[in-house]
Amino acid sequence: MRMIPELPEAVPAEPVVPSPALPGPHAVAWARRRRAMAEIWLAFRRNRQAMVGLVILVAIAAMALLAPVLANEEALRAVNTVDNPPWASPSREFLFGTDNLGRSVAVQFVFGARISLLVGLFATVLTIVIGTLVGVVAGFFGGWTESALMRLTDWFLVIPFLPLAIVLARILGPSVWSIIFVIGITTWPYVSRLVRAQVLTVKQRLYVERARAMGASRWHVVRRHILPNVGPVILANTTLTVPIAILTETTLAFLGLGDPTRASWGKTLQEAYDAGAITRNAWWYYLPAGIGIVVVVLAFTMVGRALEEILDPRLRERR
């Protein structure tokens, strides 16, 4: 009898495990940016000068934010300080002494930090926005657009900065927002020149040319390729623009063009000078505000120079 060969047992098929999906281009781009930011922060932390400046700025910003908790704003009004001794030197009751009206200089210092930082930061934002917009449009589009915008920029650069700011502040009137507008509208040309030079370099790179050849729109090229590469320059320039804005606010307030209803470090210096604090040797009146301005400007400069060095390989090589 013929034997029928046995068929081999069927081996169950292994389940097919789908391979993990590859990340899209947007995810890859964001991952690269996060990695780059992590590297920048690591280099920033290793820079002792940058960390000292950052700690100072955080401390002063915390003091400004907590001003209503640390001091009573009503003490800034002379009608509430008639019982305080005028020209009192620093003591346990009045940490920084009092002014000619009996107001606490420490309260003026704490609340003055809020206005000085507010003006410095908001004016810097306005400066960076206008300067970046003009620089990107001029550098990317070129032609008559670039020519017109650069002539406008040159016009602002030719006119002396401080006299123009004084005239505009006088026309607009004394207020915090007028000072912010004046500083922003007179300092953006320096940013636009820097951004335009960076855009002219970036738009000649191969990946930008390839994106154009593939039919990418101008807005896509600017948003995906130009701005991310100009960003580090803008970031470093921002930290260096804030001290300029603070010094400008101090100058305008000292000249009597600031908001008379708000305490600021510049206004404190102006009132101390008008009250004769220098001739009376009342150093406690003007010294805290002066030291505060110097420390904040120095701290922002330290952070800005460190960022500039981290983001610019040429500066790292020189060091």
Regions found by a protein language model. Give the residues of each.
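Gly/Trp-centered helix-boundary motif
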Residues: 1-132, 136-137, 144, 272-303, ...
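Amphipathic alpha-helical segments that mediate coupling or scaffolding at interfaces
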Residues: 43-44, 109-112, 116, 137, ...
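Generic hydrophobic transmembrane alpha-helix motif, especially the helices
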Residues: 95, 99, 105, 126-205, ...
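Transmembrane alpha-helices
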Residues: 114-130, 219-251, 300
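Glycine-rich helix-loop "coupling/hinge" segments at transmembrane-helix boundaries
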Residues: 157, 168-171, 183, 198-199, ...
